[in-house]
Amino acid sequence: MQNTIRIIGIDPGLRRTGWGVIETLGNSLRFVASGTVTSDGELDLASRLCQLHDGLAEVVHGYQPHEAAVEQTFVNKDATATLKLGQARGIAMLVPARAGLRVAEYAPNAVKKAVIGVGHGEKQQIHMMLKVLMPKAEFKGNDAADALAIAICHAHNRQAVTSRLAALAG
């Protein structure tokens, strides 16, 4: 017998960290909620990271996901920006891990491939496919949409692993 699994996807960012919560049962997906956690750009880095931590902790506590997925960081030419993104990503991984959740990581192209079928695509394609996969999905902005896509990527990957394990158990 299968159980419903609640997954939170997190799209880390220092200004805005997107989050999206879905439920999966077998191959079906159901939208639960999405949003963003923001930090005040006028504050020092440590205070901004605390804001992200507290906001994400509130989301995880409120929606009680079973598993979490976080997008991997890409390295760009601005080393300082990359380091700050890495620190925000650390918060995005720490919060669900401290709540006892297993945290999976996915490359941006793996997320796009899971949602739109190819590893390179436009934000508009992701938005459109989110509505196809979960017609009741509501998201404001790219960060929340990306977080939902990350959660869907994890749902597809965990389903593939479950199917392989079932086949091996035969």
Curated annotation (Swiss-Prot):
**Which residues of this UniProt protein bind Mg(2+) 2?**
E71
Q: What are the subcellular locations of this protein?
A: Cytoplasm
> What Pfam families does the record tag this protein with?
RuvC
The Enzyme Commission number assigned here is 3.1.21.10
GO MF term (any one): crossover junction DNA endonuclease activity
- Catalytic reaction(s) noted: Endonucleolytic cleavage at a junction such as a reciprocal single-stranded crossover between two homologous DNA duplexes (Holliday junction)
Q: What is its main location?
A: cytoplasm
Describe the task this protein carries out: The RuvA-RuvB-RuvC complex processes Holliday junction (HJ) DNA during genetic recombination and DNA repair. Endonuclease that resolves HJ intermediates. Cleaves cruciform DNA by making single-stranded nicks across the HJ at symmetrical positions within the homologous arms, yielding a 5'-phosphate and a 3'-hydroxyl group; requires a central core of homology in the junction. The consensus cleavage sequence is 5'-(A/T)TT(C/G)-3'. Cleavage occurs on the 3'-side of the TT dinucleotide at the point of strand exchange.
Enumerate the NCBIfam families for this protein: ruvC (TIGR00228)
Name of the protein in question: Crossover junction endodeoxyribonuclease RuvC
The organism's taxonomic lineage, starting at the top: Bacteria, Pseudomonadati, Pseudomonadota, Alphaproteobacteria, Hyphomicrobiales
